[in-house]
């Protein structure tokens, strides 16, 4: 694609996103907001209308003269599937074209499950979603998948996902050949960051840092409207940032990684260590420790379990150190905490903020908001929906 065509597609996506953000909006207001001349906006919106992605929806108010025609995104033009392929779960949503969820499914998978079994489960849940899809003008437009690892985005190959024990898995090709639909693959934290930008209520934030805390830890960085990817597209692997020289070996083969101290896995390990040392209460004790998961610990903390509260505070403390480093490096306007950590409650958030504001040098000069995701565990799946829309519109063959 030449530069002119690329710029046209970027502007087209920018206009579509602006309409999506405002629900209904006039061409004149779009022109002011995106800093494009009225003729360009008119031509591109007319193309979007012809293609079925935008519709005219009544008239706006006018202080004098002709009332402006209002535009809105055609939510029923087609459907999108977003998938968060986690280490111990698969989370899928089927949405309309504005990200409203029509059908949703969570499927647990066993930790350490073989690649073939995980793919089999993925195909089963995809088949269920496709069967559940209602008829629309363009049908299912694409499938977006977020994966916890390093992804070569253009080819859709999972180069390395240490917590899944995957290496060089051509996931895009495998899913496309099975279902005959366009497939878009990215790192789950990048997808989560995009989900927050598009659907999380942070559309006006220029510099957003999303930190996904589950079995592993990853980060997605949004600058302007774009996810920052680095030289080869591998930026954001903050879970493998070294914060200790002498710790146990991480799943990646390194030692002292942040994941070893501040992830869901670290929380479970810490609870077991506490119980083995005799620290127990009615919720967390020798009778419950072997069967519990992170969800149980979080619920116990919300029920005022001292053991669970102490463990979550410790995790927040260590995660805060990692995030303080990221704040110093990237200087974001906001840090959004997602995935499992978004359910950890006020105690977790208060301690996390305390550490970030104490240790991040730049917070003396620039206030950085630290928030939990309003999307909770849907940031990645909705980000995958946004990824399908944005990647699809980046190429002229999508219609």
From Swiss-Prot:
DNA-binding region, residues: 27-46
UniProt key word DNA-binding: yes
PROSITE patterns referenced in this protein's UniProt entry, alphabetically: ROK
InterPro entries associated with the record: ATPase_NBD, HTH_MarR-typ, ROK, ROK_cs, WH-like_DNA-bd_sf, WH_DNA-bd_sf
One Gene Ontology term from the biological process aspect of the record: D-xylose metabolic process
Gene3D superfamilies linked: 3.30.420.40, Winged helix-like DNA-binding domain superfamily/Winged helix DNA-binding domain
Molecular function per GO: DNA binding; DNA-binding transcription factor activity
Positions in coiled-coil regions: none
Keywords assigned by UniProt, alphabetized: Carbohydrate metabolism, DNA-binding, Repressor, Transcription, Transcription regulation, Xylose metabolism
Family: Belongs to the ROK (NagC/XylR) family.
Function statement: Transcriptional repressor of xylose-utilizing enzymes.
Protein name per UniProt: Putative xylose repressor
Native source species: Caldicellulosiruptor sp. (strain Rt8B.4)
Annotated gene: xylR
